[in-house]
From Swiss-Prot:
GO-annotated molecular function: structural constituent of ribosome; tRNA binding
Source species: Coxiella burnetii (strain Dugway 5J108-111)
GO terms for cellular component: ribonucleoprotein complex; ribosome
Lineage per the UniProt record: Bacteria, Pseudomonadati, Pseudomonadota, Gammaproteobacteria, Legionellales
Quaternary assembly: Part of the 30S ribosomal subunit.
Name assigned to this protein: Small ribosomal subunit protein uS10
Job description of the protein: Involved in the binding of tRNA to the ribosomes.
Keyword terms of this UniProt record: Ribonucleoprotein, Ribosomal protein
HAMAP family: Ribosomal_uS10
Amino acid sequence: MSDNQRIRIRLKAFDHRLIDRSTREIVETARRTGAIIRGPILLPTKIERYTVLISPNIDKDARDQYEIRTHKRLVDISEPTDKTVDALMKLDLAAGVDVQIELLNKKSGA
C-alpha cells in the first residue's frame, strides 16, 4: 500500500465483551504483520432509555424502564502493508459486532 495511507476501523456492539475481544483480535493481527497501531480508542457509549407503562388502564406509577447501550471503539492502523490488509480480510469476528473500515490519506503536515 502507499506510504501516505492509513486504515481506520470503527467497531460497534451492544455487548462490551464482544467488542473488546474483536478489538484485541484486530490489534494483534495488525501488529503481527508489522503495521503501526493507534488505539484502541474508547468512544463514548450511547445509552438509549425507554420507559413503558405496565398497566394498560390505570396506575400511571407502574412503569418499566429499559436501556440499550451501544459501545464503540476506534483503531487506526498507520503504514499498513499488503499482508496487513490480507490478514484483516481473513479475520473472522463475532456476529454481534458491526465493523466499518475506512481507507484514509494522511495529511502532508501530520
